[in-house]
Amino acid sequence: MTNQESQSVKVVFVTRDETLQPEAPLPPVMVPTSLKRLGLSEIVNQLLDTETPVPLDFLIVKATAGDGGASILDEESASSSSVLLRPGASLESFLADNGLSSEVSLSIEYIRSVLPPSFLASFSNPDWVAAVDINARWTGDLKPVIASGSYDGVVRLWDHSGHVTGQLVGHNSAAKAVRWISNDQLVSGGSDRLLYLWNPDGKKYRRKEPGQVGKKELNYDSEEDSDEEMLDELPAASTVTPMAALHGHTAPINDLAVHAKTGKIISASADGSVGLWSTDYNDMPAIEPHTAAAGGLTSTSAQKRRKLANSGSGATGLGAARQRGPLAVMGGHSAAVSAVAFHHSDPTVAYSVSLDHTIKTWDLATAEAVQSNAGSPDPSVDTRSTSFSLLSLCTLPQGLIACGSSARHITLHDPRVTAQVATQAKLVGHTNFVSSLSRGPESNPFLLASGSHDGTVRIWDVRTTKSLHVIHRETLTENNAVFGVDWKQNLGIVSGGQDNKIQINNNPQSA
């Protein structure tokens, strides 16, 4: 045995997983520095006296010299100080990589191993997929579970087998955002500056019988079938007229967020503003219908697909919808607003990110930006500035805000601390714009999924700065940027993008 193999280091094992909490704090132990993940997992399972061994991963939280032990993990601590012990790496290699000796004391957080997500299915769409959203209330029946917004202006509803069960025709340019409000209500936003409220009839969610709509009809890449033939085979009843058209923005809508319990919608627009709306059109002021919307479809094929989706349904788009104005339009950004999100637990608070490099906090009760030093003689807007354009946003249960950037990384911000502290952590791995973010299921509040123009979706544990897993597109094309990603426990990870595909990967569940 060499001298290196015989070295040991003092370790304290801690966890935030309530299902893995010991009855009393685990005592410090001396472990060989040659141990890797499996060896550490065996030790922790022995200390916990588990009936069945639990596969574990390890986050090295802190390394301090000469303190006689490691500090207890702080529930409110930022996520940037942890380093994931990668597969194949040992404590010895971690110490060497960080310039540490075995005389330090290590605090190591143990977490359940997250299994890599596997590919489940891929559905063809006629045009680029700008946005996807999973119906969180779906329970495995034949109703639609995925809503997608497409660059041909059509919002499509899909069941879990890839059948198009509804086509929502209203936008005259790219449908860039779509969100479920309830089992039978959705909202969409487009490059035509409009939001649409939809209430598809439940009768339209039936599975088509064999020979009506199947895989052949969904294969829009097939050379033997034209778009017209495939879309004509969808019954007219599966095309839906918008319930209301919402006006207020003067430039394309980039993102939407919904808080169903309070019936509120917020929108991000390229006009630099955040719109506030209701899920009930009766709560919003009636306005005169606009005679035209900007940004109409320029592609002949896209116009044809939209016309076919609309044919025979009796829908007349904007003219058939009730015209409503916003509850409020909140200005303040100096460039396009790229994404919006509600606070994770307070529906009166919202956040927005922009190409102007900033994050703003909004008080929806007053429809104004939150003041960072309200009550003082010189209050200022709570604005957090970064050095790069921000493209995507989601809120996390710990109170953190995750922002995807044009600089290819994800930054974590804590709105509870002063705005002068811009970044709490930086998650690095993507090689192009981070265009979409979605937090993981409630069962693990630290998981996050990101979609990028590099053609991948990455899975993160925000307690460490490196991704856990990378999902590649099954479509082997050169142009495969991911524009939208959503992650729900009832289905898995759904992504869509430049390859005209909606891809489903299963939940990378904890072992």
Swiss-Prot record:
GO terms for biological process: maturation of 5.8S rRNA from tricistronic rRNA transcript (SSU-rRNA, 5.8S rRNA, LSU-rRNA); maturation of LSU-rRNA from tricistronic rRNA transcript (SSU-rRNA, 5.8S rRNA, LSU-rRNA); ribosomal large subunit biogenesis. One of its GO terms (molecular function) is ribonucleoprotein complex binding. WD repeats lie at residues 124-168, 170-208, 248-287, 332-372, 383-423, 429-470, 477-511. Residues 208-219 have a biased composition (Basic and acidic residues). Component of the NOP7 complex, composed of ERB1, NOP7 and YTM1. The complex is held together by ERB1, which interacts with NOP7 via its N-terminal domain and with YTM1 via a high-affinity interaction between the seven-bladed beta-propeller domains of the 2 proteins. The NOP7 complex associates with the 66S pre-ribosome. Interacts (via UBL domain) with MDN1 (via VWFA/MIDAS domain). Belongs to the WD repeat WDR12/YTM1 family. Component of the NOP7 complex, which is required for maturation of the 25S and 5.8S ribosomal RNAs and formation of the 60S ribosome. This is Ribosome biogenesis protein YTM1. The lineage of its organism: Eukaryota, Fungi, Dikarya, Ascomycota, Saccharomycotina.
